[in-house]
């Protein structure tokens, strides 16, 4: 099904057809934090609602996690990387300050059509 588009006249619909996620295996709890700074699990939980966070190894980048998640999403959707028209990645922790982590992910995951 095609839908109207002011630039080209018609365009295919967009949608999310697969989801993937990946987080580091190392867990840092509030008790771990309390051992490093003057605070407590109760204070952190009360003020932030956070009970634990995942910590990536120093040699693991955001795009490394995103590649695994994108491969899961593609597999879940029953597609191949060649079928992907767009990759959207939003992060507050990019691999490098002035390059697109989405572009790095696209290249590493071998998604050519974006």
Please name every model-derived segment.
Residues 13, 52, 84-86:
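A common structural microfeature
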Residues 1-42, 47:
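N-terminal amphipathic/basic leader segments beginning at the initiator methionine
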Residues 45-64, 91-114:
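Conserved catalytic cysteine-centered active-site region
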Residues 69-85:
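Phosphate/pyrophosphate-binding loops at sites that engage ATP/ADP/AMP, CoA/4′-phosphopantetheine
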Residues 18-19, 86-88:
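Outer-envelope exported proteins of Gram-negative bacteria
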Residues 42, 80-86, 114:
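Short acidic capping loops at alpha-helix termini that bridge into adjacent secondary structure
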Residues 15, 43, 68, 72, ...:
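Alpha-helical scaffold segments in soluble metabolic enzymes
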Residues 10, 27, 34, 38, ...:
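Electropositive phosphate-/nucleotide-binding environments in soluble metabolic enzymes
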């Amino acid at each position: 099904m095609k839908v109207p588009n002011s630039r080209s006249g018609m365009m295919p619909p967009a949608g999310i057809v697969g989801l993937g996620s990946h987080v580091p295996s190392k867990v840092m709890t509030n008790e771990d934090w309390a051992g490093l700074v003057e605070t407590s699990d109760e204070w952190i939980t009360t003020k932030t609602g956070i009970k634990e966070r995942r910590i990536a190894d120093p040699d693991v980048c955001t795009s490394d996690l995103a590649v695994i998640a994108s491969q899961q999403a593609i597999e879940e959707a029953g597609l191949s990387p060649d079928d992907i028209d767009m990759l959207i990645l939003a992060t507050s922790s990019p691999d490098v300050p002035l390059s697109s982590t989405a572009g790095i992910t696209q290249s590493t995951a071998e998604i050519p059509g974006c």
